Amino acid sequence: MITKTSKNAARQKRHARVRAKLSGTAERPRLNVFRSNKHIYAQIIDDVNGVTLASASTLDKDLNVESTGDSAAAAKVGELVAKRASEKGVSDVVFDRGGYLYHGRVKALADAAREAGLKF
């Protein structure tokens, strides 16, 4: 019987392939993106030490958005994570799109983070 593979399982396989080649260091940590149907999350991670340096999501109380699942909310999360990273002294990052296509909410978050001062 032919079964359809889950989109999330395929994304996880793509992410695992990328993560085998991509790692964040203390000098250049990894900007990781996770997208759900309702929310979007971003973390800046130092993989060498296993530490999250900064994070932001649409669940944050200081982020006032009407809708949490659209590109405008993702852009605000990108600005917020870039601001929190600059407070910790992080300016250069490696972008990890998490196996998602670089389009829509993921692209909006990345563009907003770039405009707010992160370099990748």
UniProtKB/Swiss-Prot annotation:
Residues 1-22 are annotated as: Disordered. One of its GO terms (molecular function) is 5S rRNA binding. The keyword RNA-binding applies. It holds the Pfam family Ribosomal_L18p. One of its GO terms (biological process) is translation. GO terms for cellular component: cytosolic large ribosomal subunit. The keyword Ribosomal protein applies. CDD domains: Ribosomal_L18_L5e (cd00432). It comes from the Bacteria. Keywords: Ribonucleoprotein, Ribosomal protein, RNA-binding, rRNA-binding. Residues 10-20 have a biased composition (Basic residues). NCBIfam families: L18_bact. Belongs to the universal ribosomal protein uL18 family. This is one of the proteins that bind and probably mediate the attachment of the 5S RNA into the large ribosomal subunit, where it forms part of the central protuberance. Part of the 50S ribosomal subunit; part of the 5S rRNA/L5/L18/L25 subcomplex. Contacts the 5S and 23S rRNAs. This is Large ribosomal subunit protein uL18. It comes from Bacillus velezensis (strain DSM 23117 / BGSC 10A6 / LMG 26770 / FZB42). The lineage of its organism: Bacteria, Bacillati, Bacillota, Bacilli, Bacillales.
